[in-house]
């Protein structure tokens, strides 16, 4: 089937454009000041239709960045090569955040940024998944999350119908898989991350969208 409708949903909506622009700005320092002796290396988890990927790749074009586009399903991988292969050094792979990366063929401690857009909350145990994701990040690197932090009732008849929506098994969540910004901070601290910040600010008008960009550092 066609991915065009889903791609439009995750890129054209005003809220998506705003939050993806924040995520794109967050990766700028890695592009402007790449690691010595090699191009930047980025791993995206749960890439799906590539809504956030598109914004990041626009920022990365011409930088020589090695970009790993991964998803728990292989259904999106061929389309990713069509859309993004000419702009970055693209690698694609099936990846499940509930399993250790190295056993799935991902090199440990080697990515300058690991990013996930509304994907990491799908993990069964967030503290465990956060710790495993941390193991993929090089010292000094970052985790960049885009996450919905507010649950709305209409989710129950949309995303709530997706298989796996309720399969979480940790103490951080009771009824829905989404976490507040403060709960994300707790999960990431347990996972070994430091210097955790989020945007937009809690008291801003933009925060009413219920979406956050969360940055966390590995030292």
Please annotate each region the language model reported:
Residues 1-219:
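4′-phosphopantetheine-dependent carrier domains
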């Amino acid at each position: 089937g066609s991915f065009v409708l889903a791609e439009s949903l995750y890129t054209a909506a005003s809220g998506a454009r705003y939050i993806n622009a924040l995520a794109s700005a967050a990766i700028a320092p890695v592009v402007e000041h790449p690691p010595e002796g090699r191009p930047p290396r980025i791993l995206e988890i749960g890439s799906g239709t590539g809504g956030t990927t598109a914004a990041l790749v626009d920022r990365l074009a011409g930088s020589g960045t090695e970009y790993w586009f991964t998803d728990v399903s292989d259904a999106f991988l061929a389309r990713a090569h069509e859309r993004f292969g000419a702009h970055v050094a693209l690698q694609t792979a099936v990846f499940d955040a509930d399993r250790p990366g190295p056993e799935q063929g991902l090199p440990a401690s080697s990515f300058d940024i690991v990013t996930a857009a509304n994907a990491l909350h799908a993990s069964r145990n967030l503290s465990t998944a956060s710790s495993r994701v941390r193991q993929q990040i090089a010292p000094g690197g970052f985790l960049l999350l885009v996450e919905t932090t507010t649950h709305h009732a209409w989710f129950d008849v949309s995303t709530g119908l997706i298989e796996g929506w309720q399969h979480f098994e940790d103490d951080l969540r009771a009824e829905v898989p989404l976490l507040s910004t403060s709960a994300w901070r707790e999960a990431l601290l347990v996972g070994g991350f430091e210097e955790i910040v989020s945007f937009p600010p809690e008291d801003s008008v933009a925060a009413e969208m219920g979406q956050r960009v969360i940055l966390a550092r590995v030292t």
